Amino acid sequence: MYKDIIDQYNKAIFEVYMKRSLVSLEDNGFKYKGINVLQCPINPDYNEPKFQPTINLWDIVSCNKDLKFFVGQLFLYRDLINNPLEELMPIENGKLISTYYQNLYDRRYCSFITCCFEKSYNFWDRIGDTIASFFPDLLKIHQVDFSRIIDQIKTQQIEIEHFFWLLNFKENEYQELNRYRKDFVNYYQFESKYRYDHSMNLSDLIGLEKIWAEKYGFPEYFKKHLELSSEGYYQMFSFLEQIQNERNRS
């Protein structure tokens, strides 16, 4: 009954993918920079029942693919959302205040922002699980996350270029992402925080410009994180492959 509508919707999303050059790990036949994404190195000596490498790999691919979908949604909806600088109402003394009669497009856009944070964090959490499976003595499985395992490996003084990429990402882009994520996933959703910030800046145009610039800029922000996640997978893959080769030679 709704197939035609769904097909038209998907056509619009695919056009956004093309226009914005949004690419996931499953695109191009699961090939990325010369590697087969589905042939991720596995530690055959790691026998932790709570870690299933095949399921974990598909979770990585799915989170990356889902992030691409939600980034596409952000670009699709952005030009239709409420702009607080264009929705001003005069009050006494000639002052203007910003209103926020949220439309449907804005509501969904806000929801997709929170989804992007969730998918980004889940992706890196699974990357951390994969890396930790090669270093089982560094952390107990319930302690593992991306940041902790990278910090632990750093103490091992491993001199591998691919690890340095992961470390640099962890100490820069990931820290910012995780700071956002803690606010918008653990505590309040993006929409709730935005509503509060808007209410605190109703007549402050400079303050409104700041929160609007952040909200409007999230599609580009998450496009960058989509690219970083694919590159991060490649760096993890190459790092573990090198670790595996060195261990096989010893």
Task: Label the predicted regions.
Residues 1-65, 91-94, 100-111, 129-250:
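Acidic, Ser/Thr/Gly/Pro-rich intrinsically disordered interaction regions
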Residues 123:
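Phosphate/anion-contacting hairpin/loop surfaces
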Residues 83-95:
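Short acidic, low-complexity segments enriched in Ser/Thr/Gly/Pro
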Residues 109-120:
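Extended HEAT/HEAT-like alpha-solenoid repeat tracts in very large eukaryotic scaffold/adaptor proteins
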